[in-house]
């Protein structure tokens, strides 16, 4: 059997139900010449059962189990089994539009050189009730911390800060020397850090294809912000140690400013009158906590 052109790698942990829907959407793609690799990062639910039940829908399918070591390690593990010349990373809660994979492949056909990566668009799934908090999360101009696709409006290229592994494809040759750094154990920065290394050392060029759409089927509430931002804070210190030239950590004056805007009186006023600023200030309160934890 001839190896497929593309390998799709999906790291997952205890989300069997949505993983099944993710695989269902892959089975409906207009472009089908791909290998699917599900990397189970130590799940205790029915992830293996769901994966096996869908494996018969794909000529090239592999289920890989590992002890819980995080998404970056899971993606690296998936790469060991990848046979395609192009790698597409997606999240287990990303439901791709029928033409999304084709959109990635057309862009790679247009730009066949080895140093190319393609960023697809991620939107909230129509079934998900999008709250004010979730809208802020995906608003780059308001300091949201999930995605910042609004900053790419009208653009065809993006820099390493947009190396989002929820929906991104890349030539496998680019990843022969560069893997996800396993020093990142908490949420945040491990994908951006890889993107930076690829841009710096391999001159990676990241194209943006807004027509390669994936829908994020994941309800996120405000209660998760504390853990999310503390993790980002811890990871940002690791990032800074590796790449101090980027100055990703806020200087003392900015830490002081962030501390001031995240005091309770300011938060109370912002919550009442300026919701996006409230979420931004609250996120910085937890970020500062994370910076102190490392």
Regions found by a protein language model. Give the residues of each.
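Acidic donor-binding loop at a coil-to-helix junction in glycosyltransferase catalytic cores
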Residues: 187-194
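Non-catalytic, C-terminal membrane-associated alpha-helical segments of glycosyltransferases
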Residues: 230-234, 248-294
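Short, flexible, basic/aromatic active-site loop/helix in glycosyltransferases
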Residues: 138-160
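N-proximal low-complexity "stem/linker" segments adjacent to membrane-targeting elements
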Residues: 1-27
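Short aromatic/hydrophobic "clamp" motif used to bind/position activated sugar donors
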Residues: 87
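Glycine-rich, basic loop-to-helix element that forms the pyrophosphate-binding segment
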Residues: 66-82
């Amino acid at each position: 059997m001839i190896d497929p052109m593309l390998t799709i790698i999906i790291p997952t942990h205890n989300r069997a139900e949505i993983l099944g829907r993710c695989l269902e959407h892959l089975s409906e793609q207009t472009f089908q010449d791909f290998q699917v690799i599900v990397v189970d990062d130590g799940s205790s639910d029915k992830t293996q059962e769901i994966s096996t039940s869908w494996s018969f829908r794909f000529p090239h399918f592999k289920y890989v189990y590992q002890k819980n070591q995080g998404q970056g390690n899971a993606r690296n593990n998936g790469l060991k089994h990848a046979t395609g010349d192009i790698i597409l990373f997606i999240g287990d809660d990303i439901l791709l539009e029928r033409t999304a994979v084709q959109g990635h492949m057309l862009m790679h056909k247009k730009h066949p050189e080895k140093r190319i990566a393609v960023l697809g668009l991620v939107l909230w799934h129509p079934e998900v009730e999008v709250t004010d908090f979730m809208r802020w999360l995906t608003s780059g101009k308001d300091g949201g911390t999930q995605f910042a696709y609004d900053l790419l409006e009208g653009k065809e290229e993006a820099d390493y800060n947009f190396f989002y592994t929820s929906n991104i494809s890349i030539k496998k040759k680019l990843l022969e020397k560069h893997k996800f750094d396993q020093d990142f154990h908490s949420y945040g920065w491990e994908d951006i850090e890889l993107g930076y290394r690829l841009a710096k050392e391999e001159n990676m060029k990241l194209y943006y294809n807004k027509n390669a759409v994936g829908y994020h089927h994941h309800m996120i509430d405000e209660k998760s912000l504390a853990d999310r931002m503390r993790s980002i804070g811890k990871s940002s210190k690791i990032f800074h140690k590796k790449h101090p030239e980027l100055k990703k950590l806020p200087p003392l004056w900015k830490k002081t400013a962030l501390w001031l805007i995240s005091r309770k009186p300011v938060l109370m006023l912002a919550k009442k009158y300026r919701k996006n600023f409230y979420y931004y200030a609250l996120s910085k309160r937890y970020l500062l906590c994370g910076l102190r934890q490392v």
